[in-house]
Amino acid sequence: MFYFDLYPKMVPADEISVIRIRPRFSHASFKGDVSVLVSPYDRTRPQFEPEWHLEEDGTLVVKALFESEQEHCIQVIENFGEGKERKNDFRIFSLFPDLYALRPFKGDIHLHSKRSDGREDGRYLAARYRQAGFDFMALTDHRYYEPSVEVVEYWKDINPDFKLFPGEEVHAPDNPVHIVNFGGKCSVNNMYREDEEKYRREVAEIIENLPDKEEGKDYFTVAASEWVFKRIQENGGLAVFCHPYWSIATGNYVSEWNNDEIMKRNKFDAYEIIGGFFRWQYHSNNLQVVRYYEEMSKGRRFPVVGVSDSHGADAFGFDASRAGRNTNDSFDADLFNWYYTIVFAEECTLPSLIGNIKKCNSLAVNAPAGERAELYGSFRHVRYGHFLLREYFPQLRSWCAVEGLLMQQYLAGEDTLPALKSLMGKTDSYREMCFKRSQE
């Protein structure tokens, strides 16, 4: 439960801002002899006392200059005498203009339904993802684009606040590289299915034009991957190079030489730095992270995404009263909500999300259930991202959770549409309140 409303949470750097902290319950109200101190995390100045006052309704109003781009702690000390006091720490983040103009959106763009090798209906997955606090999602079934379109069409008028986009995982013939088509206007899988001869002819042309070829190397995989990247890009999608260090029993699924060439030629749009690996496969994500930073040291910077690659949102335990699964009470499955992307964008639309991922305005989040969150991207985005995971997204999720539950009930045949419609705009309103300049 959130004891206080604090707005705004994000403010412009190097400007005077007004922060309003309102206790939501009587037991959280400010009492005793109150004092207020502000501490910039980067120690750009010593701890100081800002201008502040308490309003009649108990709201604490703090006015201060928040320097540079960093987190700030507003400490409220209540002295009750006889050595008794209570301290509450509140945190905000000041941002330079370019990042202050963008909003954080949580999404997953690589997951599967029962239409390929997943377990659940794509419409149900959308409801579960909203329940988990996601702003956007794309279903990317193996070899099939149409299931994602069906999910988009089903929910678009019922819950327009949750942004659903088309997608697919592309498996071009004789190419082991897996590639996600996020947001493309049509299916790339259908292109090679409808005319495989044309696909092979165009791949051969790419091979012919590759420079400095060596005898005996697998240029088909490189060229076939670039054929897919180009088809996705031509149709407005984001071409994602997926899990290069996924390994099976006999070794890595894609050869290291192919990984080298694909990264060196850098024709894809985004790199899956964090993919859907189970705890016992931790080495794969570790290798992908190290490889990313090694490529950066060579002057090659890839936009990054984190994805769950989940094949189901629900798992079931065993009922102690009988032998078998308790199939009426599920819990979150492994991978679901473990790995995802935070995109800093002007709005949660496909052009804005794709455009900002390409500009490297994104973070990959690695946060398996019960474990610490690790973020990957630029230093600037990572430290802002940690603040958001702690101070922003939990409250957003509380609104999304209600929507997601109502979506599930609607899908199950219950008349929850009026209740769902009554919540429309709540998450957008919360997001803007977190950035809105407060008046004294």
Segments from the language model and where they lie:
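A metal-dependent hydrolase metal-coordination microenvironment
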Residues: 97-238, 242, 273-276, 280-287, ...
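Extracellular glycoside hydrolase catalytic/binding regions
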Residues: 244-246
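Inter-heme linker and motif-flanking segments adjacent to c-type heme-binding CXXCH motifs
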Residues: 250
